[in-house]
A protein has these predicted regions:
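N-terminal secretory signal peptides that target proteins for export/translocation
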Residues: 1-5
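C-terminal motif of bacterial Sec signal peptides marking the signal peptidase cleavage site
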Residues: 22-25
Length: 219
């Protein structure tokens, strides 16, 4: 092969290589893989409505006794649960047909938990509970219940017993006196506890009781 032919073959091979490279360079570029779609973000759960709680009080909130203690409990609930609850109260609700009206109004206002804080609300509350299955009722010192109505009480008899022990030790006549409110089971129980406490240290003690038939009736 002559030198001229060799040079021509080298040129042809070089041109072929350049052409091949050019064809590769002009080919369609590979597209990058699309980025994955962001995961859907769940909408925040709606804030639950606060529990509405109502209290029916037999006396004024400033009576310094039974109603005052209940209202302190109501305030403690607000402090403990914050915006999860909304509380309200009606004071000086008589133990009569008016109690049913007040408690029924409370249920109608959307309260889901209602406290009747005196013995005389038992029958009115039972009537309202029967008509409001979606509401929970709590009755103080009573003994009747329903599917959505329960009772609660305090251990006042314990303090009454200790007061009796002190009175039994101090008496010189062996006759003790109790000025009592209304003869309901809770009050009778406290008088009995007082007497038993006194008799535990002085078996000769007797207790005389005077009923005023009022919960709150200052002069």
């Amino acid at each position: 092969m002559t030198d001229l032919k060799k040079r021509n073959l080298i040129k042809i091979a070089a041109l072929s290589a350049v052409a091949s490279a050019a064809l590769v360079g002009c080919g369609k570029k590979e597209e990058p893989a699309p980025a994955p779609a962001p995961a859907p973000v769940a909408a925040p759960a709606p804030k639950p409505e606060p529990l509405k709680i109502a209290f029916a009080y037999v006396g004024p909130v400033g009576d310094g006794g039974w109603t005052f203690a209940h209202d302190n409990g109501r305030k403690a609930v607000e402090q403990e649960f914050g915006d999860k609850v909304v509380t309200s109260f009606v004071e000086k609700v008589p133990e009569s047909a008016d109690a049913e009206r007040v408690i029924r109004d409370m249920a109608g206002q959307g309260n889901k938990l209602i406290f009747g804080t005196t013995f005389g609300y038992m029958e009115p509350m039972l009537k309202v509970a029967a008509d409001n299955a979606g509401v929970k009722f709590e009755h103080a010192t009573g003994y009747k219940t329903a599917e959505n109505m329960r009772t609660y009480d305090s251990r006042t008899y314990e303090g009454a017993y200790m007061a009796g022990v002190i009175a039994g030790k101090m008496t010189k006549s062996n006759t003790l006196g109790v000025v009592a409110s209304i003869p309901i089971p809770e009050v009778v129980r406290n008088i009995n506890s007082f007497t038993l406490g006194a008799q535990s240290v002085n078996p000769k003690v007797k207790t005389k009781v005077v009923w005023v038939n009022e919960w709150f009736n200052p002069p």
